[in-house]
Amino acid sequence: MPGGHYAHTVVADGLVFISGQLPINESGEPCTYLGFAEQTELAMKNVATALQAGQCDWRHVLKITAYITDVDNWPLFNKVYATYVGEFKPARTVVPVPALHFGALIEIEAIALRNGDSASR
């Protein structure tokens, strides 16, 4: 997980809050040279790692917020996103933005319930 002056995962009252995850590899290097689909894949993997740190997985996700720099990439985001969340359909917001840190094309944050808790959908 990348460094920074913040927590990537915070747990409070059974909720897991995951800070925005960028397409950064395990060595902490931004992978902004990748295309949108690959950046999305890497950001989603980072969210998955943060979920594990909070003792939960995709089944426990309540809300996803994705920031994308080009709305034309929205359908591609949907395609990659669906491979992670599967039949689970958390609440979701996609926010077009002019720019992201390191020149990334996407940043993803999440809120989840800790393992053992359940949510109705």
Regions found by a protein language model. Name each.
Residues 1-121:
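Short, polar/acidic, helix-capping and beta-turn segments at strand->helix junctions
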